[in-house]
Amino acid sequence: MGFGSFFRDLRIKKQITQKQIADVIKKKPMLVSNVENGKNGPFSDNDLKKIVSFLELSKDEERQLYKEAAKARGKLPQEMQAYIIKNDEAYYLLETLARNELGSESLSQIIQMVEEQILC
């Protein structure tokens, strides 16, 4: 599933029209249609922020939306790029993970440890 299909499913689940989305981001409904049909790439990060707020997405929905946009663009969201570039430790961590190609189970354990540290 690409960004457009994911977004369409999410929009329909929230019972929101393409026109409502277009109004929120101050664009034409045709753009929303083109994004959903894969004729255009994902919305800009600025537009995504407006959409996330308007749709009142859960954290999981928001995370998935940004992930699908990043996959479609072939690059990380701007704020993640800035964080990684600014923090050598974050860069090293990602470099180490990529080099060692850890499996899902190991990555899930690392995520759980990080979340536990943040919540403490």
Positions of the model-derived regions?
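A short, Lys/Arg-rich alpha-helix, primarily the initiator
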Residues: 1-13, 107
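Conserved hydrophobic/aromatic packing and binding residues within compact polymer-binding modules
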Residues: 7, 11, 21-22, 32-35
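Short alpha-helical "recognition helix" segments of helix-turn-helix
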Residues: 19-22, 51
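Recognition helix of helix-turn-helix/homeodomain-like DNA-binding domains
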Residues: 26-42
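DNA major-groove recognition helix of helix-turn-helix/homeodomain DNA-binding modules
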Residues: 43-64
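Interfacial/linker helices and their anchor residues that mediate assembly or domain coupling
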Residues: 70-120
